[in-house]
Amino acid sequence: MQIIADLLNTIPAINSAAMSRAQRHVDGLFKPVGSLGKLEALAIQLAGMPGVNGIPHVGKKAVLVMCADHGVWEEGVAISPKEVTAIQAENMTRGTTGVCVLAAQAGANVHVIDVGIDTAEPIPGLINMRVARGSGNIASAPAMSRRQAEKLLLDVICYTRELAKNGVTLFGVGELGMANTTPAAAIVSTITGRDPEEVVGIGANLPTDKLANKIDVVRRAITLNQPNPQDGVDVLAKVGGFDLVGIAGVMLGAASCGLPVLLDGFLSYAAALAACQMSPAIKPYLIPSHLSAEKGARIALSHLGLEPYLNRDMRIGEGIVQALAMSIIEAACAIYNNMGELAASNIVLPGNTTSDLNS
């Protein structure tokens, strides 16, 4: 779809001059150089994003949760009933799920988006972007057509950009869909070139005696559909799912506005791999909240070249951990904007020179 290609070509590059200025500012704060480690690096990374105009800050925060069912559920790759997708989506509208609780704690609005839930009627309270009642069973057919994938990508990109116009400066992604770690593993396997056995995990507590079947399903899906690992849309359409497409759309939309996106868990890594195939320029805008305990997590993040901020043995979706990590973003902004400067107190520490502080 040409309109998507045109939009991706407008994704702004990170402002290296702004990052250099931010580096000098951070080095001149009341602390030894580098003593705040990755928090300093995060503040500098944020400063380079054109959407924040050189000064790391957080305005409105939005978590976009993509909800969809998956035809591959029929292959016995998940233990939860498929109906749980719809039930939990309804619970999100009541604010009682994990992502809603932690997003509220972080002061973020949760946007629950139906991109493919398998119900006869749309669920009240959800944002309706439904493409179909669940994706195709990737073990026997493509997840969707390329046209469907491109249309959903564009819809989500436009929705994300509209939120940015209305003051959102920090985006987070989440997902909901029974069996969705299976297509996620298929995407990771396809793009990284790793064998399914290396990336397929137990997801939402799949019994280990069923893991061999899940690995076989992923292998069959890739063999049957032959996704092109260089074409992110092709991978999403053939072995992905509507929720994964939606997550990729948020990343592309936020990056096109020069704004950061907090990744959540394994599903978001898979979507990021596909999105980066569409536009490598989005990578500096992606902030990994944590290292998921799902088996293929390290492989996916390593391929992306991203180092997570948290590692607490969590293996859960919804956007729960990225909501928790929003406080890290705010902490990076706080130290940048509110800490005092050494130069103002005539303090010179090893590694901080007068010329550095006055640059």
Swiss-Prot record:
Transmembrane segments: none annotated. Its EC number is 2.4.2.21. InterPro entries: Nict_dMeBzImd_PRibTrfase, Nict_dMeBzImd_PRibTrfase_bact, Nict_dMeBzImd_PRibTrfase_N, Nict_dMeBzImd_PRibTrfase_sf. Coiled coil: none annotated. GO terms for biological process: cobalamin biosynthetic process. Keywords: Cobalamin biosynthesis, Glycosyltransferase, Transferase. Pathway: Nucleoside biosynthesis; alpha-ribazole biosynthesis; alpha-ribazole from 5,6-dimethylbenzimidazole: step 1/2. Pfam families: DBI_PRT (PF02277). The keyword Glycosyltransferase applies. One of its GO terms (molecular function) is nicotinate-nucleotide-dimethylbenzimidazole phosphoribosyltransferase activity. This is Nicotinate-nucleotide--dimethylbenzimidazole phosphoribosyltransferase. Homodimer. NCBIfam families: cobT_DBIPRT (TIGR03160), PRK00105.1 (NF000996). It catalyses: 5,6-dimethylbenzimidazole + nicotinate beta-D-ribonucleotide = alpha-ribazole 5'-phosphate + nicotinate + H(+). The active site is at residue 318. Belongs to the CobT family. Catalyzes the synthesis of alpha-ribazole-5'-phosphate from nicotinate mononucleotide (NAMN) and 5,6-dimethylbenzimidazole (DMB). The keyword Glycosyltransferase applies. It comes from the Bacteria.
